[in-house]
């Protein structure tokens, strides 16, 4: 085991604060509408240009072990805020730096770090309650566009694209971001339920131009096993043929004699059918079949519940207005399912999302909700170069997270004003002793910091602007993009409540840990010995005789 350096007290804290400052100073230049870019070196290819705080934080690794510890703790603030709220990483970093900086002064003056922490926690709890009080729900598409634009560094076109996508697929719908093929941003919307399984045979295609199978007003048969024997299918096929409507079969697989018979009937025009494999695997496949059943008003034919394929009737089949099947995807549009049953299923899946432990499970469950509740929208990001594409795509993803957060918990005035107004709830607080009061003061000072940094990045005098905003009331603040004072909500400068709240809570949590640190243990730097002198070159002995 390698030897360790153990550093105590002020010496340990001072080094860690240096690391905090290095990382925070690199991140905070990106804050606000006039924030600057940071250029990140890549091991191959061109550098990446970004205004995303968490992207900058993730790149920073310091040589000094103790400094690096401080930097990594603040990096944790940024990444945790990004994970929870999807945005607000720079604000969280600025708040953490301020709490650490102010707190260290009090610790150096001999105050009790644990009491300081208690004071900080008390102040943050009061501020969070105040933020929840002033928060108002997002009701209009315009507000969603404004939140998206602010998060995308005042790019209104990105905000409008996201608002348009949310209008199309609903607030529960899935919105994904992909690389576009042109210079302009594009929005593609898939209505209804889409799953990633295509036709089992190209002979089902009835629209050669688009190379897809189109079924109008079809029945949908859902079966959770393989179908290879046509005898099992015959009774239900005869009933569908009498009804004179097309049929989609969704099963684990359709093969052999069964598939061949379906294809022959299709070619001869006796019965219009198509077959696709069921989406997902294992338990997820069963759940998705059940989703399709609820969406189409049908029943999954499963032996577990005593249903067999040969006994299936028309009342077991689902129905839809239209189904389109491509080589890789199937889209069910306007299923005949009962609205109350669909709503119940969505609630059930949401409860599973709350309990899900892995991000992958949560994402898959969220997709299922979207497929039942709305649809899928794809924002294709257009740009002239790959570097610009990456930077813009990161901003679109940030804006998307911010709008989701705004829908979830509502909005507050942006530009650092919400935190500044929440100070009113803190200034009335008193701790149990002088040290706790000092902790409350630390948070009071820190909550001015985001506005100060926004103003500094805009090239204005921070103290003057902060003093003027404090004099105002409610939504009155400074719009750094235009250099004007006024009602920020009317100007469209909005922040999601969840982002502001999460940034403050995470910053205080990590900063408090740092203030209460009294010892740091790091691996000692290895002393590399100088390389040995190379040996003499052989065969040079006879050189003297040549002189």
Curated annotation (Swiss-Prot):
Indicate which residues the UniProt annotation says bind ATP.
Answer: 30-33, 51, 87-91, 415, 479-481, 495
Q: Which UniProt keywords apply?
A: ATP-binding, Chaperone, Cytoplasm, Isomerase, Nucleotide-binding
Q: What is its EC number?
A: 5.6.1.7
Q: Could you state one GO biological process linked to this protein?
A: protein refolding
Write out the catalysed reaction: ATP + H2O + a folded polypeptide = ADP + phosphate + an unfolded polypeptide
Q: Which InterPro entries match?
A: Chaperonin_Cpn60_CS, Cpn60/GroEL, Cpn60/GroEL/TCP-1, GroEL-like_apical_dom_sf, GROEL-like_equatorial_sf, TCP-1-like_intermed_sf
One example GO MF annotation:
unfolded protein binding
Q: From what superkingdom does this record's organism come?
A: Bacteria
Q: Where in the cell is it found?
A: Cytoplasm
User: Could you tell me which PROSITE patterns the record lists for this protein?
Assistant: CHAPERONINS_CPN60
For this chain, the annotated S-S bridges are none
Q: Which family does it belong to?
A: Belongs to the chaperonin (HSP60) family.
The UniProt subunit note reads as follows:
Forms a cylinder of 14 subunits composed of two heptameric rings stacked back-to-back. Interacts with the co-chaperonin GroES.
Concerning HAMAP family, the annotation shows:
CH60
Under PANTHER family, the record lists: 60 KDA HEAT SHOCK PROTEIN, MITOCHONDRIAL
| Protein role | Together with its co-chaperonin GroES, plays an essential role in assisting protein folding. The GroEL-GroES system forms a nano-cage that allows encapsulation of the non-native substrate proteins and provides a physical environment optimized to promote and accelerate protein folding.
Q: What is this protein called?
A: Chaperonin GroEL
> Lineage from the top down?
Bacteria, Pseudomonadati, Pseudomonadota, Betaproteobacteria, Burkholderiales
